[in-house]
């Protein structure tokens, strides 16, 4: 077998494994909130940064006093 065919076979194997894994993701449809219904259990809680308001940024950069 040539080098290209070996790489092609490995790429196909990885693609099949990825498709099989994504089909095994378990999710809860019975969640109360609509946004929680699309959150997968394996992912857990993703920490979110707080976005500062325009007033916070004005205070930070000296455009407005507290």
UniProtKB/Swiss-Prot annotation:
Positions where Phenylalanine amide occurs in the chain: 61
Protein location: Secreted
Annotated GO biological process: neuropeptide signaling pathway
Signal sequence range: 1-22
The keyword Cell inner membrane is assigned to this record: no
Pro-sequence residue ranges: 23-48, 65-66
Annotated GO CC locations: extracellular region
Main localization (coarse): secreted
Keyword field contains Secreted: yes
Disulfide bonds: none
Keywords in alphabetical order: Amidation, Cleavage on pair of basic residues, Neuropeptide, Secreted, Signal
Functional summary from the UniProt entry: FMRFamides and FMRFamide-like peptides are neuropeptides.
Family that this chain belongs to: Belongs to the FARP (FMRFamide related peptide) family.
Name under which the protein is recorded: FMRFamide-like neuropeptides 24
Origin species: Caenorhabditis briggsae
């Amino acid at each position: 077998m040539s080098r290209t065919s070996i790489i092609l076979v490995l790429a196909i194997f990885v693609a099949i494994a990825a498709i099989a894994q994504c089909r095994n993701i378990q999710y809860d449809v019975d969640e109360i909130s609509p946004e929680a219904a699309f959150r997968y259990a394996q992912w857990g809680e993703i920490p979110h940064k707080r976005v500062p308001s325009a007033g916070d940024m004005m205070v930070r950069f000296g455009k407005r006093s507290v």
